[in-house]
Amino acid sequence: MKKIAVSTWCTDDYAVYLRPDRLEKCINHFHPEIDFHVFGTEETENVTKDHPWLGADNVKFSDWMMVATCLPLVEDYDMVIHMDADCFCLGSLDRVIESDAELIGVRNNNFFGKAGSAQPCTSPFYEPYGSGQIGVNDFINAGFVASNDKQFWYEWRDFNKFVAEQSDGRVFNYQPWPMIRNEQDTWNHIFHAENKYTSEIIDQEGSGVTYGIINQWGDKDHCESWKKLYMKDGMVYLDHPITGEPLRTSVLHAAGVGTMETIKDYGDQYNWLYGMISEEVADHIKSIVGD
């Protein structure tokens, strides 16, 4: 059986509001075999011991921390999954776990071709990784990253380090790649690189599932769609906004939607979520986390 770890980055000052302990409960409810790791305050304070480049004056370390939080795990696990701390696990991660692809990603842009209620994310696809454009349906979100290949994490670190060191703290100076500015951009380039890794976007159109911010849409608010989540056969679903197809929804990702100021007003992000979703879905989550 595949040995799997989930990692999230959450320092103590954020943990009281984002509640990674509840994320752990939800993941272990569906997958007791998965080990959950929080890269917390102590690890963050010591990160430059192993990654001195993250402490450079010209590097905004929060744009490049993801690999550093996962690398301590890659030698001990067959699969490592990164989940942002503002994710909610509502169901099985089976599509991820069962994938044999070396890299597993989730879409950034929704069924209307937008990033929530905002404009879509796309990127030029720079050589030597590719050419042309990483388009609306292919651009992936770095809030949920999984890999069955440990070498990927080292390559991603090296790519991040190279790009970060080209910055003066404000502007990126490496002219061949002017639009690669953070780890989401580097993730997209490695994921889609030609003749490199096998890759799978698990929530593509027609997959019947959602695993991230693809399930966000609305006229004014990114997550108006979450009000339409419902329970069926003990699982959380959201209907496709165009075709009406029921989509099994395993992960919600706030992705900055609930600002920390708003979350603090609710006490934590789970109370914020409960105030937005239906009572039956809220009760489902509460039964898992013990609220």
Language-model features, listed with the residues they occupy:
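Short, flexible, basic/aromatic active-site loop/helix in glycosyltransferases
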Residues: 122-135
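N-terminal anchoring/stem segment of glycosyltransferases
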Residues: 1-58, 76, 267-291
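Short glycine- and hydrophobic/aromatic-rich loop-to-beta-strand nucleating segment
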Residues: 143-151
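Aromatic-acidic/polar surface patches that form glycan- and anion
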Residues: 9-20, 60-62, 134-138, 145, ...
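GT-A fold catalytic core of metal-dependent nucleotide-sugar glycosyltransferases
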Residues: 66-119
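Short, charged, surface-exposed secondary-structure boundary motifs
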Residues: 47-49, 61-62, 112-120, 262
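Active-site regions of enzymes building and remodeling cell-envelope glycoconjugates
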Residues: 44-69, 80, 101-104
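A glycosyltransferase accessory/donor-loop signature
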Residues: 135-136, 151-291
